[in-house]
């Protein structure tokens, strides 16, 4: 079994490297174009705020995962939003953000809220300063030959050895009527969702859990399909997925920079909602996926699955998720007040999220639009933006 796993990981690493090279080239290209930021009504709205120049020229170290929930990080950089807000930000995209935050190596990070709770309990100087994504929008992706949930029992899956400790897996397994406990599967851990995807593509596993673009990527390349969804996105069941967190030492030492970062975060999300095609282009370059995958991903985040991207803090949703997590023994007791700080949102001059959606998004991209309807509207609004991957 160990030899088989080693061979499997060697194959996956080789395949992932191929995509990684493309992603790396994309990031480099993004850096080369950094001096030619797109001028938009979003950056203009920031200039119209007449923000005072910050005396503190500290460069923020900001981290995010290769998950679509955290797109605001690369949008802030490549759409010129950080620059317009008068802050310098070094953006790093990898799966080690929680560890880096715990070690004090990052000032801010887009992190799953459960990691905030766990970090707080072990003494990590960390707080939730703004929301980023509601609960849900997390998928179980399987190979095309899987037609029933029970076929997954006993299979090799990218769900880790103890999936029962994951809230989204519990929801999806129960919806499919299959066992939650990891002992019923051959669960493997991976270093990234991209690696999980490559394992499915090369036939090494039968399924995995991930966020987009690695669900849409599987369907785009016909490698697999989205089989189940954690749908705690809105309404009475709304949960919490990931947030923009701050290292409290950084926030204490550089309060004005921290507040300006929160403003930039909100403006990046506004950009995604109102400039979806341009946002998708930035997304696809930074994440190393085809443009078509980036566009479909942005559609899901902003219309298809609801208004999932948000900076609005929802204490009730966070409490609901914590109650579920603590009841299952994911971590010890912690309260909302201990890990959430509303002061940064209040003091950073962000727009009211609900008002923004009502006035700037609903009239153009109402919920309920099909992908084709939404894309047609987006093309009309952004006629000069590319919507197809360039042929080489």
Language-model features, listed with the residues they occupy:
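Bacterial lipoprotein signal-peptidase II cleavage site
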Residues: 22-36
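Short, solvent-exposed loop/beta-turn-alpha elements that line the ligand-binding surface or hinge
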Residues: 84, 154, 232-237, 304-315
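Pocket-lining segment of extracytoplasmic ligand-binding domains
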Residues: 114-115, 195-287
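Secondary-structure end/capping motifs
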Residues: 254-335
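Conserved C-terminal helix/tail region of periplasmic/extracytoplasmic solute-binding proteins
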Residues: 326-392
